[in-house]
Swiss-Prot record:
Binding residue positions for Mg(2+): 81
Assembly with partners or alone: Homotrimer.
InterPro entries xref list: PTS_IIA_lac/cel (IPR003188), PTS_IIA_lac/cel_sf (IPR036542)
Domain notes from UniProt: The PTS EIIA type-3 domain is phosphorylated by phospho-HPr on a histidyl residue. Then, it transfers the phosphoryl group to the PTS EIIB type-3 domain.
GO molecular function, one term: metal ion binding
Highest taxon of source: Bacteria
PTS EIIA type-3 domain ranges (all copies): 4-102
Induction: Induced by lactose, galactose and galactose-6-P. Repressed by glucose.
SUPFAM superfamilies the record matches: Enzyme IIa from lactose specific PTS, IIa-lac (SSF46973)
Organism: Streptococcus mutans serotype c (strain ATCC 700610 / UA159)
Encoding gene per record: lacF
Protein name stated in the entry: PTS system lactose-specific EIIA component
Length: 104
C-alpha cells in the first residue's frame, strides 16, 4: 500500500470515527434532556459508524498480514487515533447515559 492509499484510508477512518463521535456527543445531550430512547438510537447509529471505520482498519491489517508494505502517513495515524478515542467514548457513553437515567 503506497502513501496515497494509506492517506485515503486514514481519511475514511477519520470520517467514520468523526461521525460516530458526533452521534455519541448528541446522545449525551439527549440523555441530559431525558430523551433516553433517542440517546440509545444515537449510540446504535454511532456503533454502525464505528463498525465501518473498523472495517477500513481491518483491511489495512489484512494487507499487512499478507506481506504488503504499508507506507504510514500522518493522516492514517490520525485516523487510528480518532477511532480508538471514539471507541473509548462509546464505552463511557453507555455508563454516562445510565447515570442520567438513575438521576431522573
Amino acid at each position: 500500500m503506497n502513501r496515497e492509499e494509506a492517506t485515503l484510508l486514514g481519511f475514511e477512518i477519520v470520517a467514520y470515527a468523526g461521525d460516530a463521535r458526533s452521534k455519541l456527543l448528541e446522545a449525551l445531550n439527549a440523555a441530559q434532556a431525558g430523551e433516553y430512547d433517542r440517546a440509545e438510537e444515537l449510540v446504535a447509529a454511532a456503533d454502525d459508524c464505528i463498525v465501518d471505520a473498523h472495517k477500513a482498519q481491518t483491511s489495512l491489517l489484512a494487507k499487512e498480514a499478507q506481506g504488503d508494505d504499508i507506507e504510514l502517513s500522518v493522516t492514517l495515524m490520525h485516523g487510528q487515533d480518532h477511532l480508538m478515542t471514539t471507541i473509548l467514548l462509546k464505552d463511557l457513553m453507555k455508563h454516562l447515559i445510565e447515570l442520567y437515567k438513575r438521576g431522573s
